[in-house]
Curated annotation (Swiss-Prot):
It is found in: Secreted. Belongs to the type-I AFP family. It comes from Pseudopleuronectes americanus. Keywords: Antifreeze protein, Repeat, Secreted, Signal. The keyword Cytoplasm does not apply. It comes from the Eukaryota. GO terms for cellular component: extracellular region. Contributes to protect fish blood from freezing at subzero sea water temperatures. Lowers the blood freezing point. Binds to nascent ice crystals and prevents further growth. One of its GO terms (molecular function) is antifreeze activity. This is Ice-structuring protein. Residues 22-39 form a propeptide. Residues 1-21 form the signal peptide.
Length: 91
């Protein structure tokens, strides 16, 4: 029984302490998130710049690949047309 009353007393003290802490927050604890905010903003800006650079490089690579594919398709179409014309001329 005494242990139970002691435990209840500890819980009451714990919640009472938490209530006081929430009512009077530490000024230094408030300053830490404010100081960390510029770092977060600069990190976000750097990540956005890196993403934009990666997207631009991917777009350039895609354009080069598309140009190569178009040239290959045109060459294959010309070869097929020449083969069709040669076959038609023979027969």
């Amino acid at each position: 029984m005494a242990l139970s009353l002691f435990t209840v007393g500890q819980l009451i003290f714990l919640f009472w302490t938490m209530r006081i802490t929430e009512a009077n927050p530490d000024p230094a604890a408030k300053a830490v998130p404010a100081a960390a905010a510029p770092d977060t903003a600069s990190d976000a800006a750097a990540a956005a710049a890196a993403t934009a650079a990666t997207a631009a490089a991917a777009a350039a690579a895609t354009a080069v690949t598309a140009a190569k594919a178009a040239a290959l398709t045109a060459a294959n179409a010309a070869a097929a047309a020449a083969a069709t014309a040669a076959a038609a001329a023979r027969g």
